[in-house]
Amino acid sequence: MKQEVIQGEDSYCCSLSKEVQEVARLELNETAKVRKKALAEVRKWVRSQPQIKRARLDANFILRFLRMQKFEIKESCEILDKYLTMRCQYPTWFQNLDCQDPALADLVSKGYIFVLPERDQHGRRVIFSRAAAFDPTKYTTSDMMRAHVMTFETLLQNEENQVRGFTYVFDEKAVSWSHLSIWTPSEVSKAFSCCERALPMRHRDINFLNLPWTMSLIFQFAKSLLSEKIRSRFKTHSGLESLQRSVDPSLLPAEYGGKTSVAECITSWKRELEAGREELLELDQLKVDSSAPVGEQLALVRKKSRHDSGSGSEVIRINFSGSIGLFLFSTYSPFPLTDRLLLRC
């Protein structure tokens, strides 16, 4: 089957301000010369891959991966390959990212996950999630995953977001074991496999608010396996005063000390989702030959990762009593490859 192209090669037209271009140069090694050469090399690589049956070659799409990997060609191609594989192998999580889908529309309307209208003091968009708005008796793990991926993919359409990265606020008030128990062991394993550096995002500031003490043990175990660099980006806040020291309070929803109500933030975010809807649905046309098991397809990525120490993944088992039979935490996620934590509950 000859490779098809959904969006072909285009001439890059920079939409970044001078300020953001300087951020890209300093943080991502991006210059006009580097960018032009890198785009050509990745496009050449995509065209040479027989497993990629339907591709995008436009600059906006390819630059997501280059910027994530600071224009390291090999690493960018590896992440792109994995991204395409995950989209095709797990369509219930990565496809039909339609803001008009009843479940997704309901989750957005209830304020489970939305993006604040204004950028923070670092120029980043702020992704806001409220666990209390997710009813584990009504929604599925697929609904949860698609809601998050729909949010990420919509934001990545904007190249300033690709450069700046993202700030997160997770309000964990009312989160309980019932939120975790909807995940089967195989789904948890699959979820972390999917997120193993597959989404081209820069996670810059991660804030947890109202984390229940019952969840703090799991949080601390997962956090302890991260590198110091990543751990430094995690912040826990017992109250609004602490959160407001990390995120400009004027940007937060009114219910959190800001100016704009949650309802207004949701309305604004819905408009953005609608504006990006067609491009998101077009992503479903991407296609790779996913006949080989995920482990085989991604072995090269793991082996060659510049973050891999070469010692393999160490598995740690810790016994708990509780309602969940098995919970897997992998600090791969979007972060450097490290060891895994296996919680047997």
Question: What name fits each language-model region?
Answer:
Residues 1-345:
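Basic, amphipathic alpha-helical/coil surface patches used to engage anionic, phosphate-bearing ligands
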